[in-house]
C-alpha cells in the first residue's frame, strides 16, 4: 500500500506540473483564517461555500484550475462542483502540494 501511495503521489505531482505549465490558476478554497496563515503566491482565494456564487467569475478566467485546501477534502468537493460546471479542474489536494512546484518555478 505504501508503494501505491508513492506512485499516486508521483502522478498527482506530474498532473500538477502539467496544469501549471498550461497556465492553470491555483484556487484556494480554505477559510480566510487558513489563507492568512499561508498560501501559494499568485493563488486566487474563494471559500468553498462561496464557489457556487462565484462560478461565472471562475469561468471568466478561461484557464484550467488547480483546487487546493488544507487536506484535499474541500478541494475535492470544489473540483467536483467545478467539473460539473464544465471547468477543466484537478484536485491539487493540500495547498503545499502545489506551492512546492510554484516556488520552484
Please name every model-derived segment.
Residues 28:
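Phosphate-rich cofactor/ligand-interacting catalytic cores and adjacent structured alpha/beta frameworks
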Residues 68:
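Short, surface-exposed ligand- or partner-binding patches at beta-edge/loop junctions that are enriched
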Residues 2-24, 32-64, 73-105:
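Rhodanese-like catalytic fold shared by cysteine-dependent sulfurtransferases
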Amino acid at each position: 500500500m505504501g508503494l501505491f501511495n508513492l506512485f499516486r503521489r508521483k502522478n498527482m505531482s506530474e498532473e500538477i506540473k502539467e496544469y501549471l505549465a498550461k497556465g492553470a490558476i491555483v484556487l484556494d478554497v480554505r477559510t480566510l483564517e487558513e489563507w492568512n496563515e499561508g498560501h501559494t503566491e499568485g493563488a486566487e482565494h474563494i471559500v468553498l461555500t462561496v464557489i457556487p456564487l462565484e462560478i461565472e467569475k471562475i469561468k471568466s478566467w478561461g484557464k484550467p484550475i488547480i483546487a487546493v485546501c488544507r487536506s484535499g477534502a474541500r478541494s475535492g468537493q470544489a473540483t467536483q462542483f467545478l467539473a460539473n460546471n464544465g471547468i477543466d479542474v484537478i484536485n491539487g489536494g493540500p495547498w503545499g502540494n502545489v506551492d512546492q512546484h510554484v516556488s520552484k518555478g
